Amino acid sequence: GPSSSAFFGMR
């Protein structure tokens, strides 16, 4: 989901 994308983006 969108939250996952934000998580990977932070990494």
UniProtKB/Swiss-Prot annotation:
Positions bearing Arginine amide: 11
**Cellular-component GO terms for this entry:** extracellular region
Give the subcellular location. Secreted
The chain's disulfide connectivity reads none
A GO biological process of this protein is: neuropeptide signaling pathway
Record key words, sorted: Amidation, Neuropeptide, Secreted
Explain the purpose of this protein.
Answer: Myoactive peptide. Increases the amplitude and frequency of spontaneous contractions and tonus of hindgut muscle.
Q: What is this protein called?
A: Tachykinin-related peptide 6
